[in-house]
Every structure is written in structure tokens, then in C-alpha cells.
């Protein structure tokens, strides 16, 4: 909003299909921001899922380039994204590619209504709301997206963390959230107390927080560009 000539936005791509398949615009960014303060807007785009999970990303897509479906949608309209590229000259077509991401198609009526509630122009391209990876929403644990959003709600706390964390059930059946500090000497009892208070204030009082120095974090992320960091412990861990 400060610079009419420049937009810093997110996009969504799939390695097998292409980059920038879904993308933010000024209008979708304004809509997503407004969802944080307008529950009615969040429920319009997400249904009851708005109060259970992190706010989804709101993306546009080019219907002349991609055909998007949602497989097995739930009561709120969220299901697995399925994308077909419409390029007739593609070397490998890969029709109806299921991405493993949770998404919801937004109708033109919902788009116009949401834009009006957010005080912005209605995007002229169709919208899809994306909630993150399906595998990152294990039963009995918070979603990875909700933990990321929780940590970045407080910029001062987020500045002390690397962004790597691990969710797991502990021996007593509780939920353990293990976090990696971003530098040596940061993992103090005071920061842990801040984190626990932060979790409680934002509806995650059940989390048992453990804070690690960078080199002591057992699942320390390596510079492996072939694999994504595993935020959720496997059942056998």
C-alpha cells in the first residue's frame, strides 16, 4: 500500500508443473489482512475452519493456464488441490495432479463480497484459499501452519527463533513443541516463559514448550535443498 509501483507477495508453485501457479495481488493481500480483524470475512472465505486453523493464503490464478479442482471437499469446501495445466505443448501433461495441499475454491459471489468487506477492489481473476500441506495436519496435534502463525504473531519472540520446530506427542500424551533458538545464549528460561505465556494468550495453553540452543536442537535442519524440514514427528519417532 505504501508503494503503488511495487508488490511484495507470495506465490505457489509445484516443481512438476510450474512456478507461480497461484499468486497474491494487492487485493488478495488486503483481503487476507482484513480476515484477521473481521471474523465474518474469515468465515465467508473459510467457513468454520477460520476459527480452528491458521488463516489461509488467498491466491489468484489464471484459468487460461491452469484448471483447478478440489478433491473430496469437507463441509467448509476444503479438500486436496488438484491442478491440470492447460498448455497443449507440454512435454509431460500430468493431468489432474494432486498436490497434497488443502485448498478451497472461492466463488465469484464470495470474492466480490469479501473484497467489499475488506474495502478493496474485487480481483478480476478467480480465487483459491490454501491452508497448507495436508500431511502437516496430523490428528491430535495443531497444524504446522497454526504454529507458524502463532510464532510470528510476536515479532520480538520470532526474532529469537530460527523458525525450525518439532511437534510431537510426549510420553504422557501431551503435545510437545520443541523450538530452536536462532543463536547461542538465546534459549533462556525468560524466553521460554515468554513463549508459554504467548501460547496461552493465543489459545495454545496445552502446548509444552521446550527451547533448544541452535547446536543442541536434535532435528537441526541441514542445508539440504532436496528435502523440506519435517515439523511433525513420525509415529515411530
Segment roles from a protein language model:
Residues 1-237:
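Active-site glycine/GP-rich loop and adjacent strand/helix microenvironment
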Amino acid at each position: 500500500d505504501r508503494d503503488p509501483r511495487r508488490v511484495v507477495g507470495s506465490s505457489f508453485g509445484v516443481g512438476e508443473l510450474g512456478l507461480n501457479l497461484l499468486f497474491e495481488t494487492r487485493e488478495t493481500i488486503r483481503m487476507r489482512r482484513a480476515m484477521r480483524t473481521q471474523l465474518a470475512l474469515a468465515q465467508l472465505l473459510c467457513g468454520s475452519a477460520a476459527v480452528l486453523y491458521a488463516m489461509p493464503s488467498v491466491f489468484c490464478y489464471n484459468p487460461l493456464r491452469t484448471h483447478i479442482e478440489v478433491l473430496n471437499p469437507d463441509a467448509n469446501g476444503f479438500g486436496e488441490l488438484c491442478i491440470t495445466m492447460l498448455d497443449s505443448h507440454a512435454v509431460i501433461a500430468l493431468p489432474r495432479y494432486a498436490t497434497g495441499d488443502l485448498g478451497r475454491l472461492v466463488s465469484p459471489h464470495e470474492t466480490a463480497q469479501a473484497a467489499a468487506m475488506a474495502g478493496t477492489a474485487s480481483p478480476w481473476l478467480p480465487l483459491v484459499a490454501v491452508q497448507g500441506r495436508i500431511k502437516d495436519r496430523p490428528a491430535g496435534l495443531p497444524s504446522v501452519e497454526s504454529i507458524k502463525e502463532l510464532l510470528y504473531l510476536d515479532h520480538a519472540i520470532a526474532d529469537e527463533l530460527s523458525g525450525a520446530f518439532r511437534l510431537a506427542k510426549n510420553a504422557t500424551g501431551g503435545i510437545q513443541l520443541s523450538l530452536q533458538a536462532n543463536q547461542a545464549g538465546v534459549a533462556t528460561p525468560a524466553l521460554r516463559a515468554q513463549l508459554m505465556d504467548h501460547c496461552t494468550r493465543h489459545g495454545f495453553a496445552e502446548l509444552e514448550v521446550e527451547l533448544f540452543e541452535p547446536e543442541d536442537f536434535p532435528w537441526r535442519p541441514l542445508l539440504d535443498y532436496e528435502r523440506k524440514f519435517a515439523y511433525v514427528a513420525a509415529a515411530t519417532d
